[in-house]
Structure formats: structure tokens, C-alpha cells
């Protein structure tokens, strides 16, 4: 097999390979410079170095205390806090996860290009993957596109949901809004969410208590703790889908601004399962549940 064909089969795009051409040591075959037409044989030693000399220009490094869930030379998984966008936007150039990551890499003397794999909303917490190089970004992005990254979320929603269910309802942009989304059967994009109820709580004499299926009735104030898996990844998908079936997330400033038990939407990226882009090891990264989420019923 030719070296070029081998690299393409492993996920190296034309863009990545082109960026490596000026560097003589980028591809080494048995200790010598490798070329696209070099022939690979069993037992050969192939070393790949992807040079990166410049950081993202428009991301200001800002010192932050980042909670690192996992890190190696190819990827970084951060436990994202609430009230923090993942990247800068108009009006917010310095209080984002990207700013904190830029500082983190600057302190380590490393270049930083922001490569976000799974985007999270401003008030959504939990596991968030950053790719450290173009190759790991390409492989992980392909996994995301092909639905090979299993994303498990936890959420608190109003009311007592069915024990489990699947929501298959297209989502599109709300007319007149650049942010809000809605169910749009005509122009919306396919969106599928699977959920399972883990627990239910109802207000009794001023205190929240667990509710069993046998006790289910019309409580004045009740909530469900649910686990969700996304088959697709539309903007605000969980928030829009749960509102659609009559169980919105409390504390959601866009879709249900009820702040009686929590001051932001209780949505948490709890677990990510994926194949490591280089080692091919099956990874399972879990993010601890934040305090305001776990204390919502206390």
C-alpha cells in the first residue's frame, strides 16, 4: 500500500496532508522522510508529526480555573460550568470556555487552535471535548457526524414524564429570532431524542419527596429526573423537544423561565463515549453533576 493511501484511510484529509508538506520531518518512514508514493511494508515504522505554529488570533487568553476530566496529546475534555458560552461572540469576547482554554495552553507553552467537537449551550454543564490537533479534530468530527459518539445527558423537567420515550420532531429557527428554535414539521431539520425517567419528585408540605409510579397523580408541583441520548444534534434540541411534549426544563430563560427550583436550565452533559482518534481505545468520560443540579430538590 502506498503511504498516501494509508494516511487517507486513517482519516488524514487533503488539507492536513498539504499543511505537512513544507516540513521535512512531518512524515518519517523508518527514520527517513516519507513521501506519498512510498510503499509500506509489514514491520515498517511510521512517525507522524503535525506542525502547528500559530494560535487562534481572535481568542484572548483569560485566566480561569478549568476542571479537566481527561487530557492527552490529542484531546482535552473539560467539565464546562454553567453561565459560560463555549466560544466568543458579539458582546462577549473574554468570558468563554475558549478564553480559558487559550490561557491553559499558553501557560504550557503550546499553541492553541480552538477545535470544539460537541457544542454545549451557555447554561448547559458537563463534558466538552476539544481536539488538540487537526487530525484528532477531523476524526472526532467524523465520529460526531456519523453518530458514533454516544452522548448521555441528565436533565430535570417539569411534571412526571412517561417511563421512557422517543421524540421525533423536526426543529427549525423561530421566525423573527436568531436564537430561539421551535418544532417545524415543514422546514425543520430531523431531530430525534431518546429519554428515560430515572426518578420523580413532588412537593408535599413544602418539601420535595420521591414519587413512585404507583403514586403518580396530579401533583401541584412535580419534576422528573431524566437521562437522554441524542440521535441528532440540533441547536437547543433537548430543550425544544421536552417543551414540545409538555415537560419543559425549569429555569430555561428562552423556553420556560420558571426559576422556582433552579436559576438556569438543569441540563448536564453527563457522559461521552467515543473511540480515541489515535489509539482507537474506547473512551468513556463522565462529568460529575454540579451542585445546583443535585440540590434542586433540597
Please annotate each region the language model reported.
Residues 1-298:
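RNA pseudouridine synthases
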